[in-house]
Amino acid sequence: MTPHINAPAGAFADVVLMPGDPLRAKYIAETFLENAQEVTNVRNMLGYTGTYKGRKISVMGHGMGIPSCSIYAKELITEYGVKKIIRVGSCGAVNMDVKIRDVIIGLGACTDSKVNRIRFKDNDFAAIADFGMARAAVQAAKNKGIDVKVGNLFSADLFYTPDLEMFDVMEKYGILGVEMEAAGIYGVAAEFKAKALTICTVSDHIRTHEQTSAEERQLTFNEMIEIALESVLLEDSL
């Protein structure tokens, strides 16, 4: 047990899917996993373990922002032996080549947060996904006939940013989506010798102001979860 996770030793699988919303974790467990059992509920940050096509997998919420997700990712890795984390969440698009409802596989994550500079002696740290996990996710999407975008995300510290000109810079540099956690999770994974990947669905477009409905978000969310789960099986088979 930790100050933030009250699961017993051995409660988590070696692979954990992590949405921001703990109720999304509950939904994933109830919809996609067999024999799912709740294993932690401190602060209502729900976590579950079950099986997917016979493969033991866990799912747990990580909250909003790099500080929150970093706490849970670190404790899962160092205290529960988790080897791989797949963040599954939503993002906003700033590039006109990216459309709402697109699924993005985040190979890397830029950020305006200082967390990785703090851990990397004030130098730039290349916060990147594990190649094998990313490759398996791309293949899983192809197998299911789901088009995905692959590239860089931007993990913002502020949801309500006053610096709107930064969106122009992001677009210039080909950023596919803006979210709030990937760079932190990639940094934690690197520091503690684990592996991580972020998969996002585009829920809104910052340029066009388009937004998905609740029903549309659910559909694309399901596709993202299917990609994540199938990628675990694919990588196991390699």
From Swiss-Prot:
Annotated GO biological process: purine nucleoside catabolic process
Annotated keywords: Glycosyltransferase, Transferase
Binding-site positions, phosphate: G20, R24, R43, R87, V88, G89, S90
Listed GO MF terms: purine-nucleoside phosphorylase activity
Domain of life the protein comes from: Bacteria
List of catalytic residues: D204 (proton donor)
Binding positions for a purine D-ribonucleoside per the UniProt entry: H4, E179, M180, E181, S203, D204
SUPFAM superfamilies the UniProt entry points to: Purine and uridine phosphorylases
Keyword flag Protein transport: no
Broad EC category: transferase
Listed EC numbers: 2.4.2.1
Pfam family, one: PNP_UDP_1
Reactions accelerated catalytically: a purine D-ribonucleoside + phosphate = a purine nucleobase + alpha-D-ribose 1-phosphate; a purine 2'-deoxy-D-ribonucleoside + phosphate = a purine nucleobase + 2-deoxy-alpha-D-ribose 1-phosphate
GO cellular component terms given for this protein: cytosol
InterPro entries, per the entry: DeoD-type, Nucleoside_phosphorylase_CS, Nucleoside_phosphorylase_d, Nucleoside_phosphorylase_sf
Site (Important for catalytic activity): R217
Subunit structure: Homohexamer; trimer of homodimers.
Role of this protein: Catalyzes the reversible phosphorolytic breakdown of the N-glycosidic bond in the beta-(deoxy)ribonucleoside molecules, with the formation of the corresponding free purine bases and pentose-1-phosphate.
Family in the record: Belongs to the PNP/UDP phosphorylase family.
Protein name per its UniProtKB record: Purine nucleoside phosphorylase DeoD-type
Organism name: Histophilus somni (strain 2336)
